[in-house]
Design a protein with these regions (language model features):
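Acidic, mature catalytic/reactive cores of soluble proteins
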Residues: 1-687
């Protein structure tokens, strides 16, 4: 994997001058804490979330944009100067001189490298973050040509919570402490200082502070948010690079002692070794090629959450660590549902079994009234519990983990909690979640809450409430009962599992009686829908696939083929499944615009990449010998690795061609499910 596995070439003049292409491609580097560095390939920030250092800070701060970008100039020995990178100003002023010199952008072991060519000189830039630290290294090297080449590096910043809109003015002054090759920047706020240090020949810093006004963030504009901001720069660093010596600018919110603990060379070697270990631990079918890329992409989502001291103390007392899963970059935090759906692909397929166990046990500590948290808000220690399915996915995730590890200790720890979950669902718990005693089916619904994975809500408007008896909720409920029955019988004997068996059988019988939509040849999405005044909702959605794809399929076998064929015909695309059939009157073909417009389309046609997972599982249940056919459903994701976030998989796509990627540029369950299915459909290692 040391060779570049993903490369974008900009040798042609038209490619370099295509602003949309350069600004539409993004990159992401993470630090294992939820912090990250990310921007466009052109190094022009277009989102409020873009930054060279977004630190994951302890509660109550959460993730914070600390360093926005660096403006870079190169001076050759002959005196010629050129700028790489750029910025965009309000009023349509796009300054992107570096595009004319950008010959190539590539990923090496998942880390970004830029290659700039000018007047016979080739300068390469690399970005990495130290794992487990809020520290970024930006490295420059003269790959070809005569040296020394002099670099001028001007950092631009505005300390701001990740989710906060960009500011058109900076009210708080920054104070500067400069000592030789290092700089410390502070505000009167509770933010930690931003510490900058330069490594290299003849390194200097010039105090030349000033504001950068009217900075335009085009993606924020398109998404309906404030989009003109102001940044501040303390001055600029100057440093020489040659073919023998590189230069590195370090930005960090850590203490100086930790920042200086590793030289840039040692940091790069350590990260290279860490990534090699990740690949070596993964399933042999996922160590090279597309599989290897996805293993490295998967690593970006597995984190040690910052600030949860109680979690850490509890885990450390047991000789363990705390782990969670970031649902997507840039804006999602750790979500229970996304974590449980992603767990197999992110951890079991990649050989990270210990971390999988830590994740399950961490969420097990947060069970309240038979529910695991739906999500943890940024900068908070407390979870929110408005979900009807995350807890049922917990059973699925535990099952996949046990099949991979046979970890009976974790099962013993969690088994009482799983019984308590079922008890709470049978008796009724929060948000109207309860089993209907008349038919054994699970009901969910509470006014003003979005409880299934189709959870868009804007200004109090729940777009797809799906209150009643939802198809995937009951498929998951049946699966949970059957799994718990098996675990209980193994641990406590047959007699202890009889009640669970009875509940499962009643659910199965009622499901097959109530959910079959004869006219369409598929399953109702919701039975006794509150939105349809007790009638059944016949919207054709991908949720029905879980009645086939889960370990214990609740749908009777003779109906599998029909459901699968309808899903293939109406919902399947090259990059996942539509969330609603195009023949439905509420179908929305594209996902764009302001928040309300986007939310109206979020689950009303928009394609979701992660849904390829249950489709492939269902396909292989119906066609167990046709792995090649199942692999074809994944091939559309390969060219997508060159789009949006290079080397990763987007959250959603438009529902019609050309299936433009939208939403989060890197989504945990998208990567996890494609990786899991890539391995599942591989005939040999490394395909």
């Amino acid at each position: 994997m040391s060779e570049p596995v993903r490369k974008l070439t900009f040798a042609e003049a038209d490619a370099r001058d295509d602003a949309d292409a350069l600004l539409g491609h993004e990159w992401l580097v993470t630090n294992g804490l939820g912090g990250f560095a990310s921007s466009t390939v052109a190094c022009v920030p277009t989102r409020r979330y873009h930054g060279l250092l977004v630190s994951a800070l302890p509660t109550p701060l959460g993730r914070t944009v600390m360093l926005n970008h660096i403006s870079e100039w190169v001076r050759l020995p002959n005196g010629a100067r050129f700028q790489i990178g750029g910025q965009e100003r309000a009023g349509g002023v796009l300054e992107m001189p570096g595009a004319h010199y950008l010959a190539e952008f590539r990923l090496e072991e998942g880390l970004p490298v830029w290659r700039y060519e000018v007047d016979g000189a080739v300068v390469e830039k690399r970005v990495l973050m130290l794992h487990g630290q809020n520290t970024v290294h930006v490295n420059y090297h003269l790959a070809e040509g005569d040296g020394p080449v002099r670099l001028k590096l001007r950092p631009a910043l505005q300390f701001r919570p990740l989710e906060e809109a960009v500011h058109d003015s900076i009210n708080e002054p920054y104070t500067i402490t400069a000592v030789e090759d290092r700089l410390e920047l502070c505000t009167g706020h509770t933010y930690p200082p931003l510490r900058l240090k330069i490594y290299g020949l003849r390194a200097t810093f010039a105090l030349d502070g000033g504001k950068l006004q009217n900075v335009y963030y085009r993606t924020e504009d398109r998404r309906g948010y404030p989009h003109v901001g102001e940044l501040w720069s303390p001055g600029y660093f100057s440093v020489d690079v040659t073919e023998e010596t590189s230069a590195t600018l370090v930005g960090s919110t850590e203490e100086w002692e930790l920042i200086r603990a590793l030289s840039p060379e040692d940091a790069q070697a350590a990260e290279h070794e860490r990534r090699e270990r990740l690949l070596a631990a993964a399933d042999p079918k996922a160590r090279r090629g597309v599989g290897g890329e996805l293993v490295l992409a998967a690593d970006q989502f597995v984190i040690t959450p910052s600030g949860r001291q109680q979690d850490a103390a509890r885990a450390h007392a047991a000789g363990e660590e705390v782990r969670s899963v970031i649902a997507g970059y840039h804006w999602f935090t750790d979500w229970g549902r996304d974590t449980m759906i992603s767990l197999e692909g992110l951890t079991c397929t990649t050989g990270r079994f210990r971390e999988a166990g830590w994740i399950l046990r961490t969420f097990g500590q947060y069970i309240r009234d038979g529910l695991i948290p739906n999500m943890f808000p940024d900068g908070s220690n407390e979870g929110l519990y408005h979900t009807a399915d995350a807890t049922l996915w917990f059973f699925h995730a535990l099952d996949r983990y046990l099949k991979a590890t046979d970890d009976r200790v974790t099962l013993e720890v969690l088994l009482p909690k799983m019984h308590d979950i079922v008890k709470c669902h049978l008796e009724g718990t929060r948000f109207g979640i309860h089993v209907d005693p008349k038919d054994g089916l699970l009901v969910q619904g509470a006014e003003g809450y979005q409880l299934t994975w189709m959870d868009a809500k804007c200004n109090g408007w729940v777009v797809t409430p799906r209150r009643g008896k939802a198809v995937e909720i009951n498929a998951l409920w049946y699966n949970a009962l059957k799994l718990l029955k098996g675990w209980t019988r193994e641990a406590r004997g047959e007699a202890s599992a009889r009640d669970l068996d009875a509940h499962a059988e009643r659910c199965r019988r009622s499901f097959n009686e109530r959910f079959w939509y004869e006219e369409g040849g598929y399953l109702y999405d919701v039975v006794e829908s509150w939105e349809k005044h007790g009638e059944n909702d016949s919207a054709c959605r991908p949720n029905q696939l879980f009645a086939i794809s889960l370990e214990h399929a609740v749908l009777e076998r003779p109906r599998w083929d029909s459901v699968l064929e309808v899903a293939r015909e109406k919902l399947l695309t090259p990059v996942g499944l539509r969330s609603l059939s195009p023949d439905h009157p509420d179908f929305k073909p594209t996902y764009h615009g302001d928040l309300q417009t986007r939310d109206a389309a979020y689950h009303q046609g928009t394609v979701w990449a992660w849904l390829i997972g249950p489709f492939v599982d269902a396909w292989l249940k119906v066609h167990p010998e046709d792995r090649a056919g199942a692999r074809r459903f994944l091939e559309g994701f390969v060219p997508h690795l060159d789009e949006a976030c290079v080397g990763s998989i987007s959250e959603v796509f438009d529902a019609v061609e050309p299936f433009t990627p939208r939403g989060c540029i890197a989504q945990a369950w998208s990567v996890a499910e494609v990786l899991r299915c890539w391995v599942l459909t591989s005939e040999q290692a490394g395909r």
